[in-house]
Amino acid sequence: TAARFTNNFIHKPTNIEHDKEKIVGHIASAGFSEYGTNKIIGEESIKNLKKPFNIALGAVVYKSANKAFAMALQRSVDPEDSYHNKISASWEVGFTDYNLAVGSKKLSEARIITNEEEKEELKGRLKAYGGNGKTEKGESIYRLITGNIYPLGIGFTVNPAADVKGVFAPPEEYQT
């Protein structure tokens, strides 16, 4: 699924805290990286992968759109700054359906629920619907998006929903 839709992120807007009226740039590139190491990997590598990986998006931030945000983002990518990793990027994606992954973030270890009645029964436990992200037994529960998937952009945020922290820029980028 990821291989089919990732390139559709290109040219979509980036904003502050998912506020569509605070556009600060656009996505310029898309690819994949290993989960945990962030090593760039090719599209062919992920097609049959059974372990987590990242969708890696490159963006241009317009300093002229919001100079204070651009400066905060520069500080957030600088490992020497006290503000390091305070700002992260969070996907904005529309989708027509989802299944549930229960018990683990790793799909190879999760129980996948596709039955509509079971999904409806567990829906209120999802964080997206006000739940705590756990089943009655305390198992973690996640949405596994399916159907038609529509990349909409990125929200730069201090509180990402996904297991991500910070953004990356080459050292020469955060020195300017």
Predicted features and spans:
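Signature of dsDNA virion morphogenesis modules
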Residues: 1-176
